[in-house]
Amino acid sequence: METIELLKKMISIPSFCGNEERVADLMVATWVEHGYSAERSGNNVWVKSRNFDPVKPTILLDAHLDTVRPNGNWEKDPFTAVVEDGKLYGLGSNDTGGSVVAMMAAFLQLAEKKQAYNLVCLESAEEENTGKNGIQRIVGNLGKIDLALIGEPTGMQAAIAEKGLMVVDCVAKGKSGHAARNEGLNAIYEAISDIEWFRSYRFGKESPLLGKVKMTVTGIEAGTLHNVVPAECRFMVDIRVNEYYTNSDIYETIRRNVKSEVRPRSFSLNSSAI
């Protein structure tokens, strides 16, 4: 397999979360070129070793196809792969196109020989936004998995633990009024104290593997007119949780300490480790 050329093709295809169809097509075509009939559900693509034996343990090789959107700081065309000083630049080259092509190459090397295990190679979708049409859509189709190797940019160091993720949407309430008069209650000012709490609060238990719980306010929205005191201020918080807390624990602490309404998007992505 020409891994570098395949990675260049992947980079040339925009594959933002939920829009991985064309790069998934490329994956299917690549497997066909190498003699494998890929299975597909949505934009998730996978193959199994030919002599699959359900009695043997099964190893999953997985990396995701989707990327985030490029920000404004790119100095190169994010969709044109460029090799400089032995490094390949392009959107998704590191997270995780490089892992995709490496996993595929490893599968082809190993699956052609008799092994004491089965192999499944998966190119998954919607990882960056934990979308419902990603790996959770198809994990039941893969059969029993005894060990999974997940491709992520970890500096070539094996990662054995992962922080949990909880995103919360917060709404600070005020009262509308005219900005020219001493009217209303400014919801932005009400939100400020809660935002400061998220910035400064420290959870007591620090993990030797995963470090501290980290809370980051990543978006804020309020007001539509310059002369109207806003009645609502909405902000969202990205929370990364170590193994000493569940997402429910974190939520209860937040709820006790802030005045804003707090709505978790999900409690399901707790920290995990092996």
Spans of model-derived segments:
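Active-site metal-coordination/substrate-binding segment of hydrolases
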Residues: 56-120
